[in-house]
């Protein structure tokens, strides 16, 4: 089985490829499309799916915690800018608000384990 990494930033996507090649994160495929373009069919056959993958911190952390690469899991760290003070708090009107797309994929694919995170801002 293999992992799916979704990351639109070209620099971060290349880092993912480098880390995969070096064996530091689960082997897999890096998809640079927007999550809004990803369908449930695109995810068939992947054991792990990492959305907003950045430089593979979820895959790395799971390995460090003893989570095997062949154990199914979905992870994601949605962009915080739509709701953060630094991001001007445009909320649901912000084009970076991608939770609905990820939530839809979770609903349709129904993975057994999903980990997500969102950091709190310094102002709460």
Which functions belong to the PLM regions below?
Residues 1-124:
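Conserved active-site and SAM-binding loop architecture
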């Amino acid at each position: 089985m293999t992992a799916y990494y979704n990351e639109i930033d070209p620099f971060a996507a290349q880092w993912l490829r480098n880390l995969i090649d070096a064996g530091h994160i689960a082997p897999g495929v890096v998809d640079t499309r927007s999550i809004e373009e990803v369908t449930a069919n695109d995810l068939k056959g992947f054991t792990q799916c990492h959305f907003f993958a950045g430089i593979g911190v979820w895959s790395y952390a799971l390995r460090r915690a003893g989570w095997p690469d062949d154990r199914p899991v979905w992870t994601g760290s949605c962009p915080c800018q739509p709701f953060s003070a630094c991001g001007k708090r445009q909320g649901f009107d912000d084009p970076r608000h991608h939770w609905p797309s990820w939530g839809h994929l979770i609903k349709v694919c129904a993975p057994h384990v999903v980990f997500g995170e969102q950091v709190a801002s310094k102002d709460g």
